[in-house]
Amino acid sequence: MSFLASVGVTNVDLMYVGMPRVPQEGEEIFSQDFRVLLGGGAPGTAVNAARLGIPTRLATYLGSDLFSGFARAQFEQNGVSPYNLAAEGETGIPVNVTSAMLTPGDRTFATYCKPTAITDELLERVYTMSKGAKLVQMQEGFLPVY
């Protein structure tokens, strides 16, 4: 069976929409709207391909935290089969979390990103997951797989 394989980190974007400006340090400004969205290149490719009816696998890092739960639910709703790259028993938040403030003239970001080591064992797991795919998208760091 043909499928698309995508490999990379998942982002969860916290979008503060309709900010009049970026707040100064120590200041609080309220946004007109707020959204939580799935982000990241690999997840975006996987979700859009799945929406087109293409069988899709995504190798990414997921944990037992709130943000990973949100990402899992989004993958499930969009027909993406995630393969978890997080180590068994790993703690913390393995997905990137970005706060984006959108103002009339531009946007500003603050991102949390947990560093992850790309080991030979991890590369082997990615190879096993993506073997047989007709198209593979790899985030930087995973290119040695091919």
Over which residues does each language-model region extend?
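Glycine-rich phosphate/adenosyl-contacting loop at the front of the ribokinase-like
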Residues: 1-61, 68-70, 77, 133, ...
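Short loop/turn microsegments at loop-to-beta-strand junctions
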Residues: 34, 96-97
